[in-house]
A protein has these predicted regions:
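Beta-strand-enriched cores of mature, soluble protein domains
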Residues: 1-128
Length: 128
């Protein structure tokens, strides 16, 4: 679920994203991300290039928290409101078994502002 924290279409746009994930080290996981979207250039055709940053807190089933930061690029189709993005995640700290966690991952995903649903594939390493 994506909730705009700023007026839609006004940049930088700040979004609150509720997550429901299946992650290898955490299992079934929920999370909350605050994402900032900034145009990275002019609209070309129907495509707006963007840069994204976010901070996320993942919560494992047992309540342990894992902190993550993301920086990447993407594009928004200004007609369909479909978004594609990619970037790097860094993991650092948390609570419980993740208190000393460090790691990284490359992520590729897509989302729709119409359906309010997104998909993310991430691959990397996490040590804790």
């Amino acid at each position: 679920m994506v909730t705009p924290l700023t007026e839609p279409g006004v940049f930088p746009e700040v979004l609150q994203v509720e997550l429901d994930c299946l992650l290898q080290h955490l299992g079934r996981t929920t999370g909350e991300a605050t994402t900032t979207v900034v145009p990275a250039g002019p609209v070309v055709g129907t495509t707006l290039p963007i840069s994204l940053t976010s901070t996320t807190t993942y919560e494992a089933a047992n309540g342990d928290l894992l902190s993550q930061k993301f920086a990447g690029t993407g594009q928004i189709d200004v007609v369909t409101l479909e978004v594609e993005f990619q970037g790097m995640e860094t993991f650092e700290g948390g609570t419980g078994r993740f208190s000393d966690a460090v790691g990284f991952a490359h992520s590729v995903g897509s989302a729709s502002f119409v359906t309010n649903v997104g998909f993310l594939i991430t691959k990397g390493r996490l040590a804790y």
